[in-house]
């Protein structure tokens, strides 16, 4: 992953790098790989995430429709 440093502005380049890494899910991946996760724990986590996403989508849909 590359970020251009313009006018020796390292702070701005770091900010851009962090934004790119966040968008691509690098931080999330690092957090998940920090410790070994058993396959059964992984399935349970993914199922819980899917349920959370479905609830969020339903909430947004109801909010748009005005219920």
Swiss-Prot record:
GO terms for molecular function: structural constituent of ribosome. Keywords: Ribonucleoprotein, Ribosomal protein. One of its GO terms (biological process) is translation. Gene3D superfamilies: Ribosomal protein S8. This is Small ribosomal subunit protein bS21. It comes from Paramagnetospirillum magneticum (strain ATCC 700264 / AMB-1). GO terms for cellular component: ribonucleoprotein complex; ribosome. Pfam families: Ribosomal_S21.
């Amino acid at each position: 992953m590359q970020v251009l440093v313009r006018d020796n502005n390292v702070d701005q380049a770091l900010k851009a790098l962090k934004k790119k890494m966040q968008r691509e899910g690098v931080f999330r991946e690092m957090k998940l790989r920090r410790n070994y996760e058993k396959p059964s724990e992984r399935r349970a986590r993914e199922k819980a995430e899917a349920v959370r996403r479905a609830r969020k989508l339903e909430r947004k849909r109801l909010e748009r429709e005005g219920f």
